[in-house]
Structure formats: structure tokens, C-alpha cells
Amino acid sequence: MAKRDYYEVLGVNKSASKDEIKKAYRKLSKKYHPDINKEEGADEKFKEISEAYEVLSDENKRVNYDQFGHDGPQGGFGSQGFGGSDFGGFEDIFSSFFGGGSRQRDPNAPRKGDDLQYTMTITFEEAVFGTKKEISIKKDVTCHTCNGDGAKPGTSKKTCSYCNGAGRVSVEQNTILGRVRTEQVCPKCEGSGQEFEEPCPTCKGKGTENKTVKLEVTVPEGVDNEQQVRLAGEGSPGVNGGPHGDLYVVFRVKPSNTFERDGDDIYYNLDISFSQAALGDEIKIPTLKSNVVLTIPAGTQTGKQFRLKDKGVKNVHGYGYGDLFVNIKVVTPTKLNDRQKELLKEFAEINGENINEQSSNFKDRAKRFFKGE
């Protein structure tokens, strides 16, 4: 008997998308699955649907099928056309019905403990020069009474009464395919197959207790905001003898009142007067470690930037130092006495400038307005 067209089997047209093909397969597989449909021929119908989906859900197989039909270049797409390992497509769909695949993690295998995170706020100076700080952190530690075993000292473990030592239990679930029996990890022993004769009175069988622990943290010289250090083995205790997790300390750096930081470089804003800008000057400015004298050349303008090499922050990885950049702003005086005004007017005249003096004082400006000046 000739095979039906795969598109016809699934009830879709040849231009159907992957999602449309998958949707059609889901609908038909629910209807004809042998565990649900007991009618004669349902089993063969389900196999036909599965075979059609296996081909049309695979791009390469679909291209070959569209070109050659059932008599493809590799001997067709029948039951001989693909092996058991190629059924991943619809096995993935049914995994949601039957509770997962066959691979199960050994519940008794050693597992590393969870990593923890702690946020530490430090000053700009502490970040630049480094320091040591003590922190207090609340975390799970190995129970001091049972040493992590979970059992009361002097007692032992016994076979789990719920799963009889299997570590897994069989349960029935209502699914879209009807009632399906699946295996799950035992909820009582969590897969170990054992339970306590008497749990530890301190940790109630958990093997851990929550305590506040003090730790010393080394703040590296040159650390920046949002960077972190790892304290190996200071995380949560491992499971089944596994190693402890790690503690990651994340730094939050407070801004400086003097400098702005960008990586290893720092910036300092320097205001200078009109006279200093015009004539030049030598000005003492701060750096990270001491004051230095900065030479301001005559004619310096607002926006001029001076670079002081290696006066920035030490690179946290040891790759030298950043630079200090000094940004210049020429400040215009807002209050002038008569003598200063006289000198500036004289300066303007020498430059051939005709200055129409304006007052910054509201009363003076009002008087000039009403006088028509």
C-alpha cells in the first residue's frame, strides 16, 4: 500500500511553518496516542503521524522529501529511513507529558555549595590606596553539633521508609494523554534512600546552621566601582561532602569631593582668574599623594586640559598608573570695584574696543532703562 503524503497526514499545506507542523502533530498525537485511543488502527495511525512529523520537522529531511518524495536519495523516509536516535523531535514533546528524560543526577554525589555575594561600600581613598576591612555576614555554616551529617550524634541513618531505599517513587499524574505513571525523587529522603533514626537537634537534619561570621577582606589598591574579589571557600557548605562555595565581595565606591575617576585616570577641575589666564601663573594643585605646582601658560583658555602623567590611580592588575587631567575654567569676575572697572576700560581702549558697559545690578539697569540709555 502506497504511503500517504506527509503533509496530508498532518493536515497542513506544503508552505506550513515549523510551528504549524508542530501544532498539527501535537493535536493528532493526542488524538491517536495508543494510551488514549483504543480503537483499532489507532496505533498504526500514530506511527504514521510520528513518521511524518519526524521528516517534516527536520529541515534537511523536509528538503529531500519535497524534492524526491518517499523515494529519497538515501533509501526513503520509511521505518528504515531513520534510527532510534533520530526520534529526539517528538521525544522532546512527550518529555513534558512523562516527567523528563532518562538521565538523572545522582542525589548522593558530592556537590559544591552555593556561591554568595556581599556588597561592601568603601571610600574613594580606600579604593585608590587599598585597605583591609572586617565584615560581618550571615550565612549557612556546617552544623557544629553533627558536623554536617544531619543525624543526632550517636545515632545512624536507616533505609527510607517512604521509598524503601530506592531514592525514587512512582506517582501517577493527570496529563493531556490521560493518567501517566512517572518516577520522581523521593520527597522524604530527597533521593538519598536513607533517613535519620533521629535528626540532629541543632540543625533539624539539614546539616547546616545559620550564623553571623566575621571575615577580613583585602581591598586591592586601585579597585574600581562594581569590581569584586573572591574569597574561596567562604560560601555555603557543600552537599554530600562536596566543597564549600565561594564568597564574592562587590565594591561600591563613594565619589570623591575633589576628583572624578574614569578607570585609572582621574580629573581635577581648576578655576583660574582672568588675570591668571592672560598673564600665566604657577598654581598649587592636589594630586592623590601630595600637592604639586602646575604652570599655567599666558593666554590659557577655558577648556584647556593639562595632563600629569602617572599621577592617576594604580592599575588594580599591576599595569602601571593612570594619569591626572586638569581641566581649566577661566572665571569671569562678577563684582568689580571702581578701580578694577577703570583698568578694564583702559585695557579695552588700548585694544580699540568700544565697550557699552552693562550693570549686573537690577536697580542700575532699571535706572538706565528709564533714562533711555
UniProtKB/Swiss-Prot annotation:
Per UniProt, where does Zn(2+) 1 bind?
Answer: 143, 146, 200, 203
Q: Which CDD domains match?
A: DnaJ, DnaJ_C, DnaJ_zf
Tell me which residues make up the J domain.
5-69
State a single Gene Ontology molecular function.
unfolded protein binding
Sorted alphabetically, which PROSITE patterns does this protein's record hold?
DNAJ_1, DNAJ_2, ZF_CR
Biological process terms from the Gene Ontology for this record are:
chaperone cofactor-dependent protein refolding; DNA replication; protein refolding; response to heat
Q: Which cofactor does it need?
A: Zn(2+)
Which note does the record give on the cofactor? Binds 2 Zn(2+) ions per monomer.
Where it mainly occurs, coarsely classed, is: cytoplasm
Source taxon at top rank: Bacteria
**Ranges occupied by CXXCXGXG motif repeats:** 143-150, 160-167, 186-193, 200-207
Gene Ontology CC: cytoplasm
Q: Which Gene3D superfamilies match?
A: DnaJ domain, Heat shock protein DnaJ, cysteine-rich domain, Urease metallochaperone UreE, N-terminal domain
Q: Where are the zinc fingers (CR-type)?
A: 130-212
Tell me where in or outside the cell this protein is found.
Answer: Cytoplasm
Q: Where does Zn(2+) 2 bind?
A: 160, 163, 186, 189
Q: How the protein assembles, per its UniProt entry? A: Homodimer.
* Reported function: Participates actively in the response to hyperosmotic and heat shock by preventing the aggregation of stress-denatured proteins and by disaggregating proteins, also in an autonomous, DnaK-independent fashion. Unfolded proteins bind initially to DnaJ; upon interaction with the DnaJ-bound protein, DnaK hydrolyzes its bound ATP, resulting in the formation of a stable complex. GrpE releases ADP from DnaK; ATP binding to DnaK triggers the release of the substrate protein, thus completing the reaction cycle.
Q: Which PANTHER family match?
A: CHAPERONE PROTEIN DNAJ (PTHR43096:SF48), DNAJ HOMOLOG 1, MITOCHONDRIAL-RELATED (PTHR43096)
**Listed HAMAP family:** DnaJ
Protein's name according to its UniProt entry: Chaperone protein DnaJ
Q: Which organism is it from?
A: Staphylococcus epidermidis (strain ATCC 35984 / DSM 28319 / BCRC 17069 / CCUG 31568 / BM 3577 / RP62A)
Gene that codes for this? dnaJ
